[in-house]
Amino acid sequence: TRDCDENQYDFIMSVGGDGTLNEVISGMVDSHKKIPLCILAAGTVNDFANYLNIPNSVNGIVEMIKNFNVISSDVGKINNQYFINVAAAGMFSDISFVVSKEEKKKFGPLAYYFKGMTQLPQQLSTNLHLNVTVDDESFEEDAYIFAITNTNRVGGFDGIIPFADIN
């Protein structure tokens, strides 16, 4: 993504899940790419793609590319890391990083729930002290989980943040 020449391509395609999409977005933002992004949802949960109702059938994907519709989306940044769907810390926020490819292949989205249940005792002891600064305003707070989201889908759950909007 970082090295592509925008003048040679009509769009960049992200093939994978939310993690892959985040990596592609990070490369695009870091290198100031203004080329459209096409999402092929091939991950386990695909929260961002599902929020956008991106098809996952071959025919649906072909139609999507033929009738390419460009939309804008905000991209967030926390501690020099970009995110397009969600940035989280605290309880259960590390689950997506500890579920193996084998577990995802065998159990699909349930792999995340199984892993979360096995780690519940450790997760209950998770506590964060947050120092948040937005523009010129700051506040401190203790919390079990902290999340900023661009859509209403997080961890395969729909409607978590009803008023979330990608732009």
Tell where the protein language model's regions lie, with residue ranges:
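Gly/Ser/Thr-rich active-site loops/lids in small-molecule metabolic enzymes
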Residues: 103-111, 153-155, 162-167
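Helix N-cap/beta->alpha junction signal
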Residues: 16-17, 88
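Glycine-rich phosphate/pyrophosphate-binding beta-alpha loops
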Residues: 88, 92, 147-163
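Short conserved active-site loop signatures built around small residues
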Residues: 18, 146
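ATP/NTP phosphate-donor binding region
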Residues: 1-15, 22, 26-27, 31, ...
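Short, solvent-exposed amphipathic alpha-helical segments in soluble enzyme
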Residues: 3-5, 29-30, 100-101, 162-165
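Catalytic core of DAGKc-family lipid kinases
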Residues: 30-145
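Short glycine-/acidic-enriched loop or helix-start segments at secondary-structure transitions
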Residues: 23-25, 49-50, 157-158
